[in-house]
Amino acid sequence: MSTDNFERNYRDAQDRVERLRTQIDQINNARPGQSVASQKYLMKATWATLQTDISNFDQLNYYYTNEPHKYPSVSKKEIQRRINLIAEIKGLIEGQLT
């Protein structure tokens, strides 16, 4: 995950969280007897992608915290903002969806 793509990657992760919530709602609101196999398949794929996002954000968080010199074009203030955004998205993913 490149720092140049941080905002896009963060937005993509937010979109996946919303997509997963929608998929969960569709499964929960299905009529009795209605097949939800396709929604479950999509939900599992979205969840797997979010797990990858978490892993990538964890790695980036490590670099921002322990090796900020690898990102000379990113200010300390911006690094802290990104660390906070990473914690926020992880909280959404791990807290509300697990």
Predicted regions: what is each one?
Residues 1-98:
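Structured binding elements
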